[in-house]
Amino acid sequence: MEIAILHTDVYALAHHHRFQWEEAQQNYVILFPEGMVKLHGGAGEVIKRVDAKATVGEVVGDLIKSFPDAPNIEAEIIGMFEMALSKGWLRKV
């Protein structure tokens, strides 16, 4: 099943999940009762902006401004939202 991500959607971290910088890993991670996920590349930059207030469009716009030279960034951001939703890391507000 494909997940449709709209620019007007707003997301938050799923219940019982916590996002943080893990000094030992030198990376952003998502902690949840079953374990931990280490976020690679720009994934941490996307999740860092998921605050139950910003729309997907606002997150995309902010990341495009922050990383203007990143090719195909919008598609990668939407892909990150799709993956995070399919894994149960995010919930729609």
Feature names for model-found ranges:
Residues M1-K48, V93:
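Acidic, low-complexity/disordered tracts enriched in E/D and polar residues
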Residues G35-V93:
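Long, charge-rich, low-complexity alpha-helical segments
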